[in-house]
From Swiss-Prot:
The protein's name in its UniProt record: tRNA modification GTPase MnmE
Cofactor binding, note field: Binds 1 potassium ion per subunit.
One BP annotation, GO: tRNA methylation
UniProt gene name: mnmE
Residues that, per the record, bind Mg(2+): S234, T255
Length: 452
């Protein structure tokens, strides 16, 4: 019995531009054989890759809108299928009418990320590049956008594939030595295998470091300001933000709730959180604010404990901070109001404990704090080498490194050595999507915009 021909992909459609009003709105359609679709919609056959002025018509022939029709025939399109882009006036009613007409012609509403998923399934993008599409859209800083664009262009994937290919070459020689022990030719000995393995580990370590920097660009850090009332936390937030975001008064307890401000330092997004001053109080509202302060501390990446240069330090508060802070969080003590004592800005470090002297009022020493925040984040600029990475990429790179370390330990047993190389290769393949479970793909693409 002859096998059935594969069913052509059903057409999908979605509004590709952001909701709201604008000069231009775009409806995107992807599927098979869209020339007939365009003829019914516009009354003419579309010309490939040519911007054509067209009238978009409803089922009765009435004009919905007049705009630009673009047609990209398969496989030379974003999705690898026939793609139509209908550029009309960007009003929400017009866009909905145009989308409804596309659905009436047989397309179905695209799921989130379905256009990009089809591009991945049709080999137009690998999985890391597909994720970079969403990361570029969501980038909150120029540095993050540039890094996402490098990943989208394939730079991250190419480096992963280079390391994977080096692993394959080494595996090939190891397995040939195992499979053909009777051959007079020695394919590989331990003395040559370990230097090659060390070179691969060095490349992978460097890529992981750059990927960590990229992950920082993508997610940023939570920086929480804590301390007693009226020590200058809100003034410090305003200095970091470069504008007056928090109310500053001489009245203790002015800040009752957490105030969040997004700032950038060298392209790194920081989420700085000013909190209610920590003290014993009978005020119900203030107590709620203090409870929220501790909740913010418990999920902080960096805790800035602000103290007054004229005030006494309190061991009890320091002990509670130590108990409540996440173990991985950095803690920095900021001695504020040095202008009142005529002191100079300064950074000191004793047994790993960092202490900064500054004035939030004048701004003296705040640059020391900015530098310290970058240091706490582990940021060291790589210029144009940073690639935007996700947590799953970091996990895969670490897993591959763990297998390479295990391979080195098992170098005397070639079968175990080869197996660890295979597992390292498999971990890297998960980054680009060579080996990816359907549920992982569904999770990744479900986070995209509808029109992507």
């Amino acid at each position: 019995m002859a096998s059935k021909a594969p069913r052509p992909p059903e057409a999908i459609a979605a509004i590709a531009t952001a909701p709201g009003r604008g000069g231009i709105g775009v409806v995107r359609v992807s599927g098979a054989g869209l020339t007939g679709f365009a003829q019914q919609l516009c009354g003419r056959e579309p010309q490939p890759r040519l911007a054509t002025l067209a009238r978009f018509r409803d089922a009765d022939g009435a004009t919905i809108d007049e705009g630009i029709l673009l047609y990209f025939p398969a496989p030379a399109s974003f999705t690898g299928e026939d793609v139509l882009e209908l550029q009309g006036h960007g009003g929400p009613v017009v866009m909905q009418m145009l989308l409804a007409r596309c659905l009436a012609l047989g397309a179905r509403l695209a799921e989130p990320g379905e256009f990009t998923r089809r591009a991945f399934l049709n080999g137009k993008l690998d999985l890391a590049q597909a994720e970079a599409v969403a990361d570029l859209i969501e980038a909150s800083t120029a540095a993050a956008a540039r890094s996402a664009l490098r990943s989208l262009s394939g730079q991250f994937s190419e480096e992963v594939l280079r390391i994977r290919d080096a692993l394959i070459d080494l595996r090939m020689l190891v397995e040939a030595t195992i499979d053909f022990p009777e051959e007079e030719v020695e394919f590989l000995d331990k003395g040559r295998a370990l230097p090659r393995l060390a070179a691969i580990r060095t490349q992978l370590d460097a890529l992981l470091d750059r990927a960590r920097q990229g992950a920082l660009l993508r997610t940023g850090m939570n920086v929480v300001l804590v301390g007693r009332p009226n020590v200058g936390k809100s003034s410090l937030l305003n200095q970091l933000a470069g504008e007056d975001r928090a109310i500053v008064t001489d009245v203790a307890g002015t800040t009752r709730d957490a105030l969040r401000e997004a700032i950038q330092i060298e392209g790194i997004p920081l989420h700085v959180i000013d909190t209610a001053g920590l003290r014993q109080t009978s005020d119900v509202v203030e107590r709620i604010g203090i409870e929220r302060t501790w909740r913010e501390v418990e999920r902080a990446d960096v805790v800035l404990r602000v103290i007054d240069s004229e005030g006494a330090e309190e061991d009890a508060l320091e002990a509670e901070l130590a108990a409540r802070c996440p173990s991985a969080a950095a803690r920095i003590t900021v001695v504020n109001k040095i202008d009142l004592l005529g002191l100079a800005p300064e950074r000191t470090e004793t047994a790993g404990a960092v202490r900064l002297r500054l004035s939030a009022r004048s701004g003296d020493g705040v640059d020391l704090l900015r530098t310290e925040l970058l240091r706490a984040a582990g940021w060291h600029a790589h210029g144009e080498d940073v690639v935007l990475a996700r947590e799953r990429h970091l996990l895969a790179l670490r897993e591959a490194l763990d297998h390479l370390a295990a391979a080195e330990a098992a170098a005397s047993a070639l079968e175990l050595f080869a197996e660890e190389l295979r597992l390292a290769q498999e971990a890297l393949a998960g980054i680009t999507g060579e080996f990816s479970a359907d549920d992982l793909l569904g999770e990744i693409f479900s986070r995209f915009c509808i029109g992507k």
